[in-house]
Amino acid sequence: MDKPTVQDIFHRFYPAYLDQYSPSPVQANVAHNIMNCKTGAYGANVCVCEDCGFVQIHYNSCRKRCCPMCQAVPKEMWMDARREDVLDAPYFHLVFTVPDILNPVIYSNQRLLYDALYHAASSTISELTADPKHLGAKVGYICILHTWGSEMNFHPHIHTILLGGGLASNNQWKDNGENFFLPIRVISKMFRGKYLEELKRLWEEDKLVFHGTAEKFRNHYTFKELLDSCYGMDWIPHCKKTFNGAQTVIKYLGKYTHRIAVSNHRIVRMDDDTVIFLVKDYRNEGQWKELTISGVEFVRRFLMHVPPRRFVRIRHYGLLCSRTKSQKLTLCRNLLGCKKYLSKLRDMEMPEILEHLYGIKVCVCKACGGHLGKPQMRMPLRC
């Protein structure tokens, strides 16, 4: 028997999930997309072999970012486009996290408080790197929001890929060699202060809502106690090892940019009531282990991580801002004496991309090896 997929799990358990929970319109739309992806619901392309007459039908995908069947090619195309943005210089990986006690409030106010995470992380990096005590230069970096832990629990955090140098005010390159140039304790205090200041401002302006387990924070004194507790905690960002070289950076980025809460390869099996999937045990050096939860709980956890509609998860800052990126990166390359890496996929059609990436020849007949003509009929959406 084939291993189950996220789509199989939703087909089996989503109706029972609806008996217990009320998904938001965005969550319901994602569930619909997952269950109907590549089933014919979104139409199909029909090709006929020019040699043997074999008819080949390809069902269309939903192309949604939360669908585990639709991320591979967009990820590769995004990574390929970013080849032109990276430099042969050190890079660092920072992870900004918040205390778990804030999770109920963040989940109730996702768009506002996710944005606040980006603002706090980006302003912390920009201010510290501009300070001559630490670097005194304008750097480039990418911030990516993840909202899940390995067990699909709610765990919002920002991954930041930071260039280990930048342009000083005199337009000269400045770096600190292979060493990380920002003190972690200073990052922690500044990030904590900026995020809690934004949270307090939104609360004072009555822009926050409180649902579910966050209901208790409607009370003025309870919310103030929450803020006081957070100010008293150490918010320790993680700085992971450095890595060099444009190609290494691209591969590293791909691990984070187009991830979803759980991928199909982590699903082990399911039965009439439960789902078993692989999770990382960080108490045991990150070893993989199996976790069993109910099918309804699996669906609930998965849908927790559906971002708000049209929410931008991958954001570029500093030297990578689109307004000045081309000019600034060209200057950096000239100063560093490194070459520009060109996109390989930009001018390719989708059949060429699939063959280049996966060796899939979509224009070759599976029956005789002959040539498949262009789609002669596009089946409409299934009613």
Where is each model-derived feature located?
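Beta->alpha loop/short-helix hinge microenvironment recognizer with preference
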Residues: M1-C383
